[in-house]
């Protein structure tokens, strides 16, 4: 009986452990990015105040940009890692999940590049002696608008990725189903509130649920691994 239960565990632990460790690192980096982010609603009439605010918090902005640079690269690698983890189970949805995850990482790379551009513009503007006819405020405003749009699109891609990956767990039980349902709920909130009300308590709750699902996902992959349900069907436990 013990041998049959043991045989139901997926043996591809060399892939599962790094995937789990990667997901755990990403979850903690997401938390750090939330704690260091600067929320600005771009308004051209207040752009000079925004530039002053960004200059006062330039170190925090740099830290946030570097966190997202590292996290974006890790998210890109998480895509193929998820594919290699779940493809042996014969699920084609793992292709879609891997594509969406890597696409989210690429989008966050663009977001990070935008953040570094904002930092450069802020430094150049503050260094000016005469700012009367400077084009930098207009450039900064456009960069802030782009930053906001990239963030909203990233919320949507994150939500779709969470729903696709969560549905895989919820339907198959390769990982505990509660992780799948947490991922689905967090993903739905990301999509529904990311564009319209990202400052609401509901969206904050959705982010907490999503990060916890990612942390549980990584922990189970790292410590226990997936469960191969096919072997249980082919070789049902003896009474």
Language-model-detected regions and their locations in the chain:
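Hydrophobic, aromatic-enriched alpha-helical segments typical of multi-pass transmembrane helices
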Residues: 2-239
């Amino acid at each position: 009986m013990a041998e049959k239960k043991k045989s139901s565990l997926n043996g591809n632990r060399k892939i599962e452990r790094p995937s789990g460790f990667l997901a755990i690192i990403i979850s903690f980096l997401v938390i750090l990015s939330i704690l260091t982010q600067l929320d600005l609603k771009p308004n051209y009439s207040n752009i000079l105040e925004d530039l002053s605010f960004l200059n006062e918090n330039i170190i925090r902005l740099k830290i946030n940009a570097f966190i997202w640079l590292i996290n974006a690269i890790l998210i890109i690698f998480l895509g193929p890692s998820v594919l290699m983890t779940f493809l042996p189970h014969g699920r084609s949805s793992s292709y879609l999940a891997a594509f969406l995850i890597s696409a989210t990482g690429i989008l966050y790379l663009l977001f990070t590049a935008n953040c570094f551009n904002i930092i450069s513009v802020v430094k150049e503007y503050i260094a000016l002696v005469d700012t009367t006819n400077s084009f930098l405020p207009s450039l900064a405003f456009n960069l802030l608008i782009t930053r906001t749009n990239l963030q909203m699109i990233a919320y949507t891609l994150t939500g779709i990725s969470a729903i696709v990956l969560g549905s895989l767990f919820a339907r198959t039980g390769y990982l505990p189903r509660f992780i799948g349902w947490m991922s689905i709920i967090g993903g739905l909130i990301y999509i529904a509130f990311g564009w319209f009300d990202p400052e609401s308590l509901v969206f904050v709750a959705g982010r907490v649920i999503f990060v916890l699902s990612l942390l549980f996902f990584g922990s189970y992959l790292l410590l226990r691994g997936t469960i191969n349900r096919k072997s249980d069907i082919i070789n049902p436990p003896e009474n």
